[in-house]
UniProtKB/Swiss-Prot annotation:
Residue ranges constituting the GATase cobBQ-type domain according to the UniProt record: 249-447
UniProt-annotated catalytic positions: 331, 439
Coiled-coil blocks: none
Keyword vocabulary terms for this entry: Cobalamin biosynthesis, Glutamine amidotransferase
GO MF annotation: an example: ABC-type vitamin B12 transporter activity
The protein's annotated pathway: Cofactor biosynthesis; adenosylcobalamin biosynthesis
Domain of life: Archaea
Keyword Cell inner membrane annotated: no
Role according to the record: Catalyzes amidations at positions B, D, E, and G on adenosylcobyrinic A,C-diamide. NH(2) groups are provided by glutamine, and one molecule of ATP is hydrogenolyzed for each amidation.
PROSITE patterns per UniProt: GATASE_COBBQ
This protein's name: Probable cobyric acid synthase
Species of provenance: Methanopyrus kandleri (strain AV19 / DSM 6324 / JCM 9639 / NBRC 100938)
One Pfam family cited in the UniProt record for this chain: CbiA
Amino acid sequence: MSAIMFVGTASNSGKSFLAAVTCAYLRQRGVDVAPFKSQNMSLNSCVAKENGEIAVAQAFQAAMAGQEPSIHHNPVLLKPKGELRSEVIVHGKPIGTMSYREYREIVFEDPWQAVLESAEILSEEHEVIVAEGAGSPAEINVLDTDIANLRVAEALGADVILVADISRGGAFAAVYGTIELLPERWRRLIKGFLFNKFLGDESLLEPGIKELERRLGVRYLGTVRHVGDFWMPWEDSEALDTHSPGRGSVRIAVIRLPRISNFTDFEPLAMEPDVRVEFVDPRDNLPEDADAVILPGTRTTISDLEELRKRGMDEEVVQAADEGTVVLGVCGGYQMLGRELVDESGGELDPGESVPGLGLLDAVTVFPSDAGKVTVRSEGVVNHPHLRGIRVEGFEIHEGRTYTDEPHLVRLRSGYGNRGCFLDGAYRTDRPVLGTYLHGIFFNRRFRHEFLRWVSGGRWKPPERDVVREAVKRNLQVALEIVESTDLPELLGE
């Protein structure tokens, strides 16, 4: 086994991107490769083959590597829950909700041991590991408990590549400062540096590159130009800030809940031609001409529902449904659509307290104190009149159990559903309102197409091509071009 690790001078430098393209490159060269990010902080997660949670970014990298997503690709996942606390997930299962200080006290117990175990398993099963760090490896105030960067590289015996985003300015100083701040034993692990997201004349960089090589004794491995045609899942809320809704005639309004999660669910909609997906802040108004309104997942269903009430958006959602606009709730959004939410666990309210839902579905969701989180892959057949008979697959990540006499949306062949009954979701027969626990449902091409046709009143026409499959195919080609434009193949032994 050999290993390579990308670390960055800062967040959003391009580590995930370069890890993904390297996985895709090695896969196409016939190498058995696996991604690895020891610790990730993300609200976008999915369910791995072991029915445990991992970050969507590592699931995507696994797909680029030609592997089925595994809990060992991301052994520690931190999911922010507000008030400076995060849910800590180790090997796919939650071990508690903690502040950062509390987490630091136990980081070398279950979390670090899980990292070492996963690294060993991947090393035994694959020829190459492509690892990714988090943030910067030179955060000197937390180096003693950093299990996401060079401590991991040391354990893997990985060659480390430092990545800097040159589009933001300050990249030369960032490379120099990062390496200089590292302890000597970790500085020796850095085998080269890359500039990412470059636009312009590369020859202008040469004097600075030569000076960095002279001062640091570290090799320059190349510059990756800004790439606009490589599809990467939205990893964090910053992606929503830069997301352009486009000019499509079919308008989908996704409410940007304060603690929105799994907004990658809606990327396939945004990839379709003539479809406009916009994320609407609760402080704003829903567009009057929206063809569909979607309430997405959230880590704090009750708190986010109260925020909608505070802003008056709850009334706008109900009005939209009354006027015939399709309203869909996914996971936490589905729970909000019901008439009541009961917090038996005391996670957001005092134990046993409840709040009214939007009342668009005759459903009650209970957050029980004696039941754990559901994390499971699911598949089934849709029951809705406009979507009936469509086979779908996805995954469930939820703590609530929903009780309803409304018709079910999906009859599951595998999974959990509303309350372990193999019936998922619900819909109204007299209004276009529906809800589901299935994340990833829009990655099912036929469901996506029929949904768009329905909400648009038949004016949307599906393309002959599969936009998601086409994007993946394009990714593989772009990956070859990117890696071969640098000195990475030499470092990889290719």
